[in-house]
Amino acid sequence: MIDFEHKLPSLNIDGKRNGTYNNTELAFPSVLTTTDPKLGCFLHKLRSNIYGERTLVFIDGKILMCDKNWIRDHVHVMKAMRHWEYNLDSFLNFIIETQREDGQFYELIKQYDDYHWKLVNEDCYVMYPEDNLTLVRLELEADIEYLVVEGAMYLYRTTGDDEWLKKALPHLEKGIDYITSDEKRWDKERGLVKRPFTIDTWDFTYGKHGSNRKIEDDTPMSIMHGDNSGVYQAMNQLAWFNRRLNNEGKAKEWENRAEELKKNMFKYLWNGKFFIHQLHLNHSGADNLENERLSLSNAYDINRFVTDTEQSRLIIEEYISRRETTNNFAEWFSIDPPYEQFLHYTPGQYVNGAISPFTAGELAKAALNNGYEEYGWDIITRMMKLAERDGTVYFLYNTDSTPQPEGGPSAWGAAALISAVDEGLAGINDIGVNYDEIFFAPKFPVTYYTELRYITGYEVSKSLVDVRYIIKEEGMRYDVYSPAKNIKAHILIPKSKNCSKLLVNSREMNFAVNKVGASIYLDFDINTIDEKPVSIEVLF
C-alpha cells in the first residue's frame, strides 16, 4: 500500500511552515498541504470576503439572510456559502412566495428612498410601507427565473427536504413557463429567451437612460446566450427535481424542452468557436462586432452543460488565444472587445471590458473539467497572487490589474473561485443530496502539492467529505471519507504516467480509460459502500 507520510493539520513539516497559527484555513471547504498554506489561505480570504457581505433584511415580519439583497447576487454566492451557511432558505423562500401571478419573480429589496422602484412600472414592484422597503423586479432582467431554480438546487442538496420541494416545485416550473412564453420575454420565432440590449447579463439598456429599466415598445431587444444556457440548466434541474419526486413523465417533458432550447441556441447563437454576445431583433446594435464579441456568460455556458466537451474546449481555447493578444493583464473579460461607449461607460470601465474574477472562477472550473487542467490551475494561481497582493478579491479589475471595487459585490467572484477549487480542482461534486452520491474527479496532480488533505461538505447538515491525497514515484492514493453510498470516480493520471493496476480498499478493480483532450482519466464506479474511508490506489 502507498503510505501517507504526514499527519494534517500541522504547523511545520521538514522545517517549513505549512499551516497557519490556529488553523485559520480550516472550514468548509478548505485544504491543508505538506508544502505551504497558500491555497488554504486563499480559500480563507474568499470565505472572509463572502462573510463580509452577509446582511439581514427585516420585511413583512420576516428575517431574511441575504448575501446582497438581490436574489441574483445571492444565488451566485450560494454556490460557495451553501457549504457553511445555516440560513440558506429565508431569502430564497421569500422570493418564491412573493411570485407574481403570471410567474414572474421579483429580485431585490431596497429602502423606499433608494428609488429602484421608480425605474420600472407599477406591476414590477411591491411596497412594504411599514418597513419602508420595496420589492422590485427590474423588468429588463431575463435571468431571475432560472437563478431561482439554481438557488433551489443549492438549497435542496443541503437538506433533501422532499416536502419543501413539493411546495416549491410548482412555483419554479411556473417561473420557467413564464420566461419561455411571455411576449416580453420570449422570441417565439426562434424559440429563445430575449432581453433588452444590455452587456451580457447586466441591467442597463443601450441607448436608454440609466433610469429606465423597463421593456417598452421602442426598447431595443436582443437574444443573449447566457439567459438561454441558464434556462437550459433550469429545465434540466426541474427534470431532476421531478425525478426525485417520482414524476418521470414530467421529467422527460422538461428534458425535451431543454434539448429544443439547446438546438435553437446553436442554430442562432453559435459562431463555431463560442456563443456570440447578442443577436439583435428589432435594431442594428452599436457596431458590427457582435459575432466576435466574447462575453462573460460563455464561461457559465460551459458549466451549465449546454456545450459538449469539444464545444467547451473551443470556448476555452478562445480565451487562451485572446490571452496571447490582449493588452489587458488577464483574459477574464467581462466583454471583449468592449464597446466604444455603453451608457456612460468607456472601454475598460465596469462591465464594458473590465476584468472579472467571476469570469476567472467559471473559466477555471470549465478548464479543469474539460481537459485543460493546467490552464485551470494557472488561473487559480494567478488569482491567488492578486489576493495576496491586495488582501482580498475585488468585484472587478482595471485592465492594468488595479482594483475596480465599485459597482457590485466582490463575493460573487469569490464564490466562483471557491467553486472552481471545490468542484474543479478537488473535483468533489454532490450529485445526490448531502453527498450521498458523489462524482469524484480530482485534479491535484497538476499542482505542485505532493500530499494534502481536502475537506468540504455542508455544515448545516453535518455532511463531511474528507479526502487525503499523496503522489509518489510508484503511484498515487486517495482516501475518501464521506456519506456517499455510491462514488462515480473520474481520476486524472499525471502526464507521462500509465496505470498498471487500480486498487480500491486493497482489491483490484477494473476501469475504463477516458481521454479528455490530451488528459487521461480512469473511470469506475464504487457502489454500495460499506467501508469508510474508501481507499483508491493508482499504481504506475
Across the structure, where does each feature detected by a protein language model lie?
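Generic long, charged, amphipathic alpha-helical segments
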Residues: 332-349, 451-462
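Non-catalytic C-terminal accessory modules of carbohydrate-active enzymes
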Residues: 362-540
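Catalytic cores of carbohydrate-active enzymes
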Residues: 8, 12-34, 40-49, 66-70, ...
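Solvent-exposed loop and edge beta-strand segments that line ligand/cofactor-binding
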Residues: 4-24, 56-83, 130-143, 213-230, ...
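The feature captures the catalytic groove of carbohydrate-active enzymes
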Residues: 110-147, 180-256, 272-300, 341-358
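Aromatic-rich carbohydrate-recognition surfaces in CAZymes
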Residues: 67-195, 224-228, 232, 354-364, ...
